[in-house]
């Protein structure tokens, strides 16, 4: 019993040591970064799928913010816990692509205003289920929490949720799926995923929104095996933040 208690105590101690000393503390970690551009004011990184952007409940370590803190730890006067520097925007854990990080308070203020005023250019590539018939289009629909499933967002009536606009363009039709380019006019949580589902074209392998269930009921064994192999190759929603345009703050 004594040994068992000591073991539990050791586990509890390790868990407590893994947590930050206070709620918002960022712990620098040596996690590789794919840096696309960097100067003394900002840097742009290509985030891989599967990497959580910001520490939170259950994800105190191993996030993009922890990696940024390590990369910038030798900059004079840099404080990883200063909200006036760091990430300017976010993308989902299982979405890959470009993010801009501000190194100075002035840069973060300037970039933040560009996002607020919707002057940035954000283009995504997405693989969606089905044959998207229109070559291009615009989806307008307020986005908010799904009252039937709080883990999902959904399109809501005009008097609910937040105004959201997504422009899309077909790049290539590939039979059962379509490759599209999506341009965000607004930046709501899960916006592209929700809007594409709203028009009947859920993202390929988007587990949260049913993009992994497309094979249910099919009797075509070879096709089913082929798609399952594709799921193994792309084990997350097929969404990539490909282009990020903004005016340099200096």
Outline where the language-model segments fall.
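Single conserved hydrophobic/aromatic residue that forms the stacking wall/gate
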Residues: 1-12
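Residue-level signal for inorganic ion chemistry
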Residues: 10, 46-47, 68, 100, ...
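Conserved beta/loop motifs at nucleotide-recognition and modification sites
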Residues: 13-61, 65, 133-142
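Glycine- and acidic-residue-rich catalytic/RNA-contacting loop of pseudouridine synthases
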Residues: 51-74, 108-113, 127-179, 229-230
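Glycine/acidic-rich beta-strand-loop module
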Residues: 75-116
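Short beta-strand segments enriched for Tyr within beta-sheet-rich domains
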Residues: 111, 189-196
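Phosphate/ribose-recognition catalytic cores of enzymes acting on nucleotide-derived substrates
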Residues: 171, 197-250
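Short, solvent-exposed secondary-structure boundary/capping segments
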Residues: 176-183, 205
